[in-house]
């Protein structure tokens, strides 16, 4: 891959390297009987990250855990996919070009107020963006990257 690589050795092991050479790996151990849902009742998750490898990998992990997840690679694409996919959750990176994750989250809340939003960031300096959203009356949960996939899965299943 041009922007990194990903590898799934088994259903319980994962690893990826992003375009900046940052590597993440781990073991996934969960009760798949509890997580796998019938196709028509699976929670839909739209995963948004400007690093395609991260968006693709997180969507694949969530799909393997029983969710119906698709990736988007920028805010504009996410808005377009949200209009067709009608996700229960949007999981978005905060720092993206053109439309950042907070701007995307605000646009989603205006159009789809029942959609849950989870912001992800590997950068500590995003408090100004979050504060701007709060001044506009929006509250969002933030999880720092890199994040273990089980933490994401747990957050989505607990928030449902």
Label the predicted regions.
Residues 56-64:
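Charged docking surfaces used in two-component/phosphorelay signaling
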Residues 74-77, 100-104:
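Acidic catalytic/metal-coordinating carboxylates
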Residues 1-44, 148-160:
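Non-catalytic signal-transmission and effector/linker regions of two-component phosphorelay proteins
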Residues 85-91:
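Active-site beta3 strand of CheY-like receiver
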Residues 96:
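Receiver (REC) domain active-site loop signature in two-component systems and cognate sites
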Residues 120-122:
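Hydrophobic/aromatic residues positioned on beta-strands within the core alpha/beta folds
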Residues 103, 124-144, 150-155:
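Alpha4 helix (beta4-alpha4-beta5 surface) of REC/receiver domains from two-component response regulators
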